[in-house]
Amino acid sequence: MKALEWMGDSLKILDQTRLPVEIKYRMAATYEEVAEAIEKMEVRGAPAIGAAAAYGYALGAIGYSGELAGLSAHMEKVQHRLAETRPTAVNLFWALRRMEDRLRDQHEAKELAEIRQALVAEAESIAEDDRRVNRLIGEHGNAIVTAEANILTHCNAGALATVEYGTALGVIRAAQQAGKKVHVYAGETRPFLQGARLTALELMNDHIPVTLIADNMAGFLMQQGNIDLVIVGADRIAANGDTANKIGTYSLAVLAHAHGIPFYVAAPTSTIDLKVPSGQDIPIEERNPKELREVFGVQVAPPEVPVYNPAFDVTPAKLITGIITEKGIVTSPYSVNLLKMMVRS
């Protein structure tokens, strides 16, 4: 299963809200349809969101039928619409900046067709970069996995969260392919259940041993000595190493620290935002209260009960053992070493 696939004039998006019960695709032919798919979490995961937004930007140009002189204003509207879909995942904004830069490079173009072709090529380049980067993350991350390891992960940072292969799950895949005996504990990840619905499905499809657990079981597993390593993905990493990821990640980091268990973040360098000094400056998306009051349309709480439903939390850098990127593994002091790595790249 691929999270998304370019079809030449539309974007084929796997509707992940229906997994694992049903495999259904959306054929997005306009940038608005891509934006809706991102908002509804039909496509999710920071790298996949970035790639989807890039294709959405290209579709904005493909769908434009006005004069060449008016394209720039139209594309500003397209970019704004896509940028407002998910505020926390920095890959979204990184991809849109790349697309905007490619559009500016076409200032001497005489035909709309030439510009459209260039934008599609840039979107495909972003997608291909993600495929390559995820393999490198897996290769570097394999070094931290012992010959036999029980690994805890949270949410879904696999192929379904990227264009291909995955970040946190990419490390696990690489370890398995290297002949290591890995067993994964996947937290269910309330309220959207990405761990239960997506991570468990991915790992089972790849014949990687996996056990699904309730989110509130993680501490007990660690206490029993059943966890050797925690690996999670990321939606935005601040300049000091503070990391925004799916709600519940911070709790796992605190538990891992208390039990002396290594806690790693796996993410591409496009997830690192050096313009954000610390986690306090990362915008945190709040989702619809219905996601907590209901489970798949079934009411599980009083309909009027107040709800606080942030989609992400921030794990302080001091709780992170290392950040696995395509450039290698970065360790503390992050404010120094992240900058060094980004300058080199």
From Swiss-Prot:
Catalyzes the interconversion of methylthioribose-1-phosphate (MTR-1-P) into methylthioribulose-1-phosphate (MTRu-1-P). Belongs to the eIF-2B alpha/beta/delta subunits family. MtnA subfamily. GO terms for biological process: L-methionine salvage from methylthioadenosine. One of its GO terms (molecular function) is S-methyl-5-thioribose-1-phosphate isomerase activity. The keyword Mitochondrion does not apply. The active site is at 235 (proton donor). Pathway: Amino-acid biosynthesis; L-methionine biosynthesis via salvage pathway; L-methionine from S-methyl-5-thio-alpha-D-ribose 1-phosphate: step 1/6. The gene is mtnA. It comes from the Bacteria. It is an enzyme of class 5 (isomerase). This is Methylthioribose-1-phosphate isomerase. PANTHER family: METHYLTHIORIBOSE-1-PHOSPHATE ISOMERASE. The lineage of its organism: Bacteria, Bacillati, Bacillota, Clostridia, Eubacteriales. Keywords: Amino-acid biosynthesis, Isomerase, Methionine biosynthesis. Its EC number is 5.3.1.23. InterPro entries: IF-2B-related, IF-M1Pi, IF_2B-like_C, Initiation_fac_2B_a/b/d, M1Pi_N, NagB/RpiA_transferase-like. The record marks 155 as: Transition state stabilizer. Substrate binds at residues 44-46, 86, 194, 245-246.
